[in-house]
Every structure is written in structure tokens, then in C-alpha cells.
Amino acid sequence: MKKFLLCFFVIGTSLTSCSKFNESLNDDFTNANEALVSDFNTPFPVINITVNQNEFDNMYLNYTEGIELEAFLNLYRNNELLISDELVEIEIKGTESATYNLKSLGVKFDDTFKNENNIVVSPSNLLPHHSIEKIKAFRLRNSGNDFKKTLLKDISYTQLAINAGLDVDLTYYEPAIVFINNSFSGIMNLRTEGNTNGISRLNDVKKGAITLAKINDPGEVEKKDGDFDRIDNFLNAIEEENLSYLKQDIDINNFIDYIIFHTYISNVDWPYNNVRFYAIEDEPFRFIIYDLDWANTRKIDKHPLAFINNPTKYSAKDAIKNPITDLFTILYQDSEFKNLFNSRYQYLVNSNAFSSEKFNAILDHNYNNIKQYMPIHLDKYNDIGSMIEWFRNIELLKENFKKREESINDLSPLF
């Protein structure tokens, strides 16, 4: 057992809840190498994956090789075993984040799993056009670029989009405590997938009905599944600035909400990267929100139109050409689309759908979910440092969101 000896000072006025935070750090906690599954009596999932240890170690060592392993999944909630020895396939996921000591895992069921009573994933809210009754695969995510900061960023920003009731497609999250062969692995984010399997289950259609493409850094299109000719026709229409074709080929309301959310949260790792768009049969293309780890890190003073026209993590001169920026530019020249976009954006700002108060409430909820167990995680991984550094990083998330909100409000009316 370990105890924290706290000695810290306040930077500026940001650590306004130090006494409250201090109270949660006074108890003993279990060493990571002593932790047992039964130590975690949580309403969110506690997962134990049983796999050949030598094969797992080899997969970890050779994480770029796409190695897939057969394994067995046990899932607990409130110390109750709800999934027992379910056959799954696991593999390492991620690019840069796959270099971390705790790596993201893709978990795929042998057969589509009936998510009765939301056993696998149980989000607090579900958008009305989505279903999570069937799950083929999910991801145990290390929080990507936020792994060394809070573990809470992607899950919190995604929840903000859900709570705002946007007409978007996205992935659903819960925190999860993960064990490998009864050995504590870490606190992760359990996330539904945004690939063809995930999108087909989300829309309750067969996988074969989905046409899906990705845009990866630096703006390269990767056709994944379905009707590749249709994807080519869509991209050609963007190149040819075929407005009438494009207005018919995409879901306009979805695209508007998709652009609004990304530009409001200043997601600089988009849209030359982290883009997925899909269609069901002959229906219009829709766009998927995911991987928000870079939100509100840079360019938080930019007008939304300036932001979308200069997509890059770096300076404006390095802006990366991509189909999404080109598509928006074409559509925004159309008065009907322009009026719809401008009025929708201003409505969401005026209605406080993305207010800092709402974001902070989400972040505080997610913080409270895992704070009791973070000392064990930090005992195994020193990337964040200490509990007080973790708390400071959470406060910085709030501060940066507030700065973006103030920047948008200073620009209002936006159009």
C-alpha cells in the first residue's frame, strides 16, 4: 500500500478546488502490481483479457506489424461478471499513440455481440438515430495524444457533441479498467468503432450496405469499403466544383453540424486527417466525428471560417489541401447553404450548446468516475507524473475551452 505526501503550490488562480481535490488523495491505494479485478467495484466496465502471454508480449514489441491474437474476454460491472470467457480477437491500434507503454487495443467478437442491457458499453446519452444493440468490435483506447495529460479529453469532447443533440455520427465511450491475464494494465477508454463494422451496427444495417472512406494526414484519401466508384465520383465532383451534384450527394444538415463542431473546438488535427465519411446504399454521404485529442490546443483565437480555410497544426503557410476544406468552400459560395450554415452556427452559440459550463460539468463527471483509481494507474505509468499534475492538466482543459468560448463570443455575431 502507498500513501501520497502532498506538497504543492497554486499557479495563478486556476487551482480553485485544491481542498476538494486534496480530500480525495488522503487514502491508501493499492500498488499496480498488487491490484486485483475485485478491487474495482465500478459501474463502468472492468475488463480482464486472457491471452497467451508470450504472444501478447511479442505483439506489444512488434506493434506495427498488425498482429492479431485470439483471446478471451471477461467483463465486470459492480463486481458482477456479465461476460464470461467470450472469444475475441485483439490487435494493437493507433499510430503515434502505439509507441506508448500502454497501447490501444482493438477487440473484435467472434460473432456479433448482442449488447443487451448495454453490457459492453452504456453511454449516458444516445443520439436518437443511433443503435448500440449489436456490437461487433470495440476499442480499448489509451486516450491517444491525451495519454500523457488527462485520459479524459476525447471522451469529454465527444460527450459535448452528444449532449448538444447534433446531427452527427460518432463513437460512444465509457472509462474502463483493463487487466491482461489478471495483471493490471491501466485505465483506458472503451470506445465503439467508427469503421465499417461500427457504423453498420450504429445504423442497424448490414456491413455490405456501407460505403466508407478515410482521409489521413496529409490529406490522403483511403477507400475502405463499399462502392469505390461512388467515392471517386464524389471526390471528382469536389475537384470539378460540381455544386448541384455535391448538394445531392451529402447530408447537408450533418455536414453543417460536423463542420460547426470541429471549428468551434478548434480541432487542428482535422480535416486533413481524422476524417471518415460513409453512405448507406444510395443515401447521401455522412461524416463521422472521432479522435478529438488535439481540440483547443492551437488557433483558439481564429474565426471559424479562417480556421476551416487554413487546416494545419502549424502556421497558415503550411495549410494542407484536403477534400473537406474544398467541399466546404464550394458549398459556402451557395447562398442557400451559406444561410443555413450561418444561422445554425449562430443558433448553437446563442443557445449555449457548447458553453464552458456544460463542458466543465461533463469533464468533472468523467474526472470523478476515475479519480479513485488514478493513483494505481500512475503507479504503473509515470507519463502524467503525479495526481496534482493530472488535476492541473484537467484545469488546463477547462481554461483552454473557456478561452475558445470567449474568442467565439468576442467575434459574435459571427456572420
PLM region spans:
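Positively charged n-region of N-terminal signal peptides that target proteins for export
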Residues: 1-4, 19
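Sec-dependent N-terminal signal peptides
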Residues: 4-12
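Intrinsically disordered, low-complexity segments enriched in glycine/proline and serine/threonine
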Residues: 5-6, 26, 401
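N-terminal processing/targeting junctions
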Residues: 11-17, 57
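Bacterial Sec-dependent N-terminal signal peptides
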Residues: 15-37
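Short boundary motifs at domain starts and secondary-structure transition points
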Residues: 35-40, 128-131
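Middle-to-C-terminal accessory/interaction subdomains
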Residues: 42-50, 54-66, 71-73, 78-96, ...
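Conserved ATP-binding subdomain of kinase catalytic cores across diverse folds
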Residues: 65-221
